[in-house]
């Protein structure tokens, strides 16, 4: 089952910051899609790796229309 991933403008804007350097939209979609189950409230998920090797966290929540990625936090 594939989940629709919605990335907020805030999260897209943060990708341009230094701490999120080399984290791509595809990395975020892959990370959000890999989380099993339902996320009823905004929750931080830690320890994802981008293709470039950068470690990052995401804050996500499930909506009726898909999985909303609220922000990205680079390490």
Regions found by a protein language model. Name each.
Residues 1-75:
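Ribonuclease/tRNase effector modules and their secretory precursors
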